[in-house]
Regions:
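Conserved AAA+ ATPase "SRH/arginine-finger" region at the nucleotide-binding site
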Residues: 488-493, 716-725
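Post-Walker A helix-loop "phosphate-sensing" segment adjacent to the P-loop in P-loop NTPases
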Residues: 457-467
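The conserved Walker
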Residues: 431, 443
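Extended, folded cores of ATP/NTP-driven motor/assembly subunits in large transport
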Residues: 1-402
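Conserved lysine of the Walker
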Residues: 447
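Hydrophobic positions on the alpha1 helix immediately C-terminal to the Walker A/P-loop
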Residues: 450
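Hydrophobic anchor at the beta1->P-loop junction of P-loop NTPases
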Residues: 439
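P-loop NTPase motor domains
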Residues: 51, 58-77, 88, 251, ...
């Protein structure tokens, strides 16, 4: 039991007055892999990421809670785990550099100013906080080599345990760990951090120079840190029932602060021995009390309530250990917060204590212990406060650090505000393994607005190419305002714009025989013309043979003009078998008939980086064919951009047409059309492009297995208000809870769910109506 008692005590070095600010930082030695030596111990820190706990269903919350209990049970014996939540307010300089658009001196600066005003306004309304979560494990080891071997095993266990909660863990380097301390010690100067271990060693500099504040002074009940003041509190009184939301409620307070939960797991044999001694002690007290009562001839007196309660609690604790897979944990909760002045600090302290009192807990100020308290709360691996509380695993797990996933990518664009945490949602789709995605929602939910907002942000902040297929003539005005070009494809204008459906760029096919993929495209084209179930196997062979015939000369050197649908028609007519004539007859209307818009050589030669293909005038007979031809033309453009090192963003409205037959009935699911789209979907990622499908017909799309696969594998989904059947389909496909899906049930326009990677976050994105951007993007009748 001596070791057990030692773990309850504070870890202090022999006292000495620090001669400099650097000396007040209790780090003895650092190593390249992020291991620190502190007070005779070694420590290492990992960063872990939030999960959707607050918006999960009660059943899912219970599951997450029990998984977190299992994680706590897996923490190593003989070591201290410190879970740290670090809130820092968004640095204005970083904010301006990463989110605000610089002016370019062109006509689009008007829109950039409006965009910047929107983001600044939303940031002012939001918490404007960045929260990071860390776990630091510290242990006494004989050497750094022994410590590294120990931390390697611990890191594997942490990754395994937290991955079961859909959280990820990242081991942080020495630079990351020093940056974390620098950001706390020097708030507002985050961008100034510079450190190179080799240079520091070569120059014999103290590594603490790069993180130390200008000055630090510890007073009776607060400390001064540079131009700021701070105070550290500890959880003194625990409620008999603590809400699992208390920790996140504290961390929602909009100030720079850090909260740490020190957890020391106790070996089972030590815990059982300790509880047995407690039970024996209580029983002895009860026996002595009864003996005194007997001596007074009082044989009917009841055992005092406090003794009975102590016996009951001790036995319950023993039962938890022996029967309910609980472990004994020694826990300590400390919290430090910063303010600009002492008056504000006192107000913040009272507000934080009030949050605790509302949950039946009491946070007290550590008087004359502010230095030890600060070093305890920092993620160093130290515990210098004697205020541990004996808890079971479940009681410790109630101090839940999880709330809601955040989406805040570096170099991203603004998508709205997190409806749970009220922080900005900033996503960079280029960081995803597959940046392709969908925007879905019923009519009037704001899906066109969402797509246009993303298009606008990309057009104003990047030099990427943007290509839009617009079947409903919704994007033209915005594209022209952004300096792009609108190409109207019409079946009724013989002298208008034409796109050759059989264009073929060098490099077409992703390294495969280009003719194979082109043949598949023409199969999908015929599928749209004739119907998914109307093409017989022998007819497919005829089409494939004719495709080879008409491309034979062109593929030798890609010189001259590529063949057209008219050439394909002529080749089919030359053949003697009646099936070839049947196929040619199906093509006649689209080659020599009135709908021959795609049978001419391409007469579009635009260099504009923002293109909108307006295909509204194609009519219902040609719209699905037009979508397919547009996709093939875009595929050629993406290949060309790849060779030139350009990034391309492609938007296809009414994408459900790829999964429904060409007649527009929407009941017969196609094969080649959806497969061609899926191949483009997969290849675009390799070619430096993203493809976004926009639709309100989710259920109709999901009748296709290919569409289901595309939805399930999409790392980006923007879901606005959904119809009931669509909502049910998406919930099953994504494994989303009823609570999450409630955000797309009768949701106002611009509200819904956004899925980025593994994160599914409810969002709100309302644009101010008194802006030119809103006027260009709105499709509401009567809004001009």
């Amino acid at each position: 039991m001596i070791f057990f008692k030692h773990r309850r005590s504070a870890e202090r070095d022999a006292f000495s007055v620090p001669r400099s600010v650097q000396k007040s930082i209790p780090i003895k030695r650092i190593y390249q892999d992020g291991v620190f030596q502190v007070s005779g111990k070694f420590s290492k820190t990992w960063r872990f990421f939030d999960v959707n706990y607050a918006v999960a269903s009660p059943e899912k919350q219970r599951e997450l809670f029990m998984t977190y209990c299992s994680f706590l049970n897996s923490l190593p014996i003989g070591a201290t785990a410190k879970i740290t939540l670090f809130n820092r307010q968004l640095n204005q300089k970083d904010f301006g550099r990463t989110l605000l658009m610089p002016m370019q001196g062109d006509h689009r600066d008007l829109y950039r100013n409006e965009y910047n005003a929107l983001v600044l306004g939303k940031a002012a309304e939001s918490n404007n906080l960045i929260q990071e979560k860390y776990i630091t494990v510290s242990a006494e080891k004989k050497s750094v080599e022994e410590a590294r071997a120990f931390f390697s095993r611990v890191g594997t266990d942490l990754t395994t345990g937290l991955s079961r909660m859909s959280s990820s863990v990242r081991e942080i380097t020495v630079n990351d760990r020093l940056r974390l301390l620098h950001d706390f010690y020097r708030p507002g100067e985050e961008q100034l951090f510079r450190f190179n271990l080799e240079d520091t060693m070569r120059r014999s500099h103290d590594f603490r120079d790069c993180i130390a504040p200008d000055c630090i002074s510890f007073q009776k009940n607060h400390y001064e840190l540079g131009d700021h003041v701070g105070r550290t509190l500890f959880l003194r009184e625990y409620a008999s029932f603590i809400s699992d939301a208390m920790i996140t409620e504290l961390m929602d307070y909009p100030r720079n602060m850090m909260l740490s939960i020190d957890i020391i797991p106790v070996a089972m044999d030590e815990a059982v021995s300790d509880i047995r001694k407690r039970i024996m002690s209580v029983e002895s007290d009860i026996t002595r009390w009864q003996q005194r009562q007997n001596q007074s001839n009082n044989f009917t007196a009841n055992i005092p309530y406090d003794l009975e309660q102590m016996r009951s609690e001790a036995k319950e604790f023993m039962d938890d250990l022996m029967s309910r897979d609980q472990r004994m944990m020694l826990a300590l909760v400390t919290l430090t917060h910063l303010a600009d002045n002492l008056e504000q600090l006192d107000q913040d302290t009272e507000a934080l204590q009030a949050i605790g009192r509302a949950r039946g807990c009491q946070f007290n100020i550590l008087r004359y212990q502010q230095e030890d308290a600060l070093n305890t709360v920092l993620p160093l691996g130290l515990k210098r406060i004697e205020a541990t509380r004996t808890l079971t695993t479940e009681c410790t797990a109630v101090l839940m650090p999880f709330k809601s996933q955040e989406i805040q990518d570096a170099g991203g664009i603004y998508y709205g505000v997190n409806a749970v945490s009220h922080n900005l949602i900033v996503c960079n789709r280029g960081n995803l393994l597959n940046g392709n995605g969908f925007i879905t929602g019923v009519s009037g939910s704001g899906k066109s607005m969402a797509a246009k907002q993303e298009v606008s942000a990309l057009a104003l902040s990047t030099d990427h190419d943007i290509i839009i297929v617009d079947p409903e003539r919704e994007y033209g005005e915005l594209v022209r305002a952004l300096g792009g070009e609108v190409i109207t494809i019409s079946a009724s204008d013989p002298n208008g714009c034409h796109i050759n459906a059989l264009d073929l760029s060098e490099g077409y096919g992703d390294g495969r025989e280009p003719l194979v993929m082109k043949s598949e495209f023409i199969m999908s084209l015929y599928e749209q013309l004739m119907g998914a179930d109307k093409i017989e196997p022998q007819e497919k062979s005829i089409i494939d043979r004719s495709v080879g015939n008409i491309y034979r000369e062109y593929l030798k050197n890609y010189q001259g003009q590529p063949p057209t649908l008219k050439d394909l028609y002529d080749d089919l007519m030359k053949q003697v078998n009646p099936e070839a004539h049947r196929i040619a007859l199906a093509l006649e209307l689209f080659t020599v008939g009135s709908l021959n818009v795609f049978s001419h050589q391409t007469n579009i030669n635009t260099k504009s980086r923002i293109l909108c293909f307006d295909i509204q005038d194609l009519g219902e007979n040609l719209k699905s064919v037009g979508l397919l031809v547009m996709l093939d033309a875009i595929y050629n453009r993406v290949i060309q951009n790849r060779r030139e090192g350009k990034y391309t963003h492609v938007y296809i409205d009414e994408i459900y047409l790829f999964f429904a037959n060409g007649s527009g009935s929407g009941h017969s699911i196609t094969n080649y059309s959806s497969e061609f789209l899926y191949k483009c979907w997969k290849r675009f990622r390799k070619y430096g492009a993203t493809l976004t499908g926009i639709t309100q017909n989710v259920e109709e799309c999901l009748l296709s297995n290919t569409a289901r696969m595309m939805f399930a594998n999409s790392e980006f989904l923007l879901m606005l208000n959904q119809a009931t059947t669509d909502r049910e389909q998406l919930a099953r496909l994504l494994g989303a809870s009823d609570t999450q899906m409630s955000y797309v049930d009768n949701a106002p326009a611009g509200h819904g769910l956004i899925k980025v990677g593994g994160a599914i976050v409810p969002f709100a994105n309302e644009l101010p109506k008194n802006t030119e951007l809103y006027r260009l993007m709105s499709t509401k009748p009567g809004e001009d």
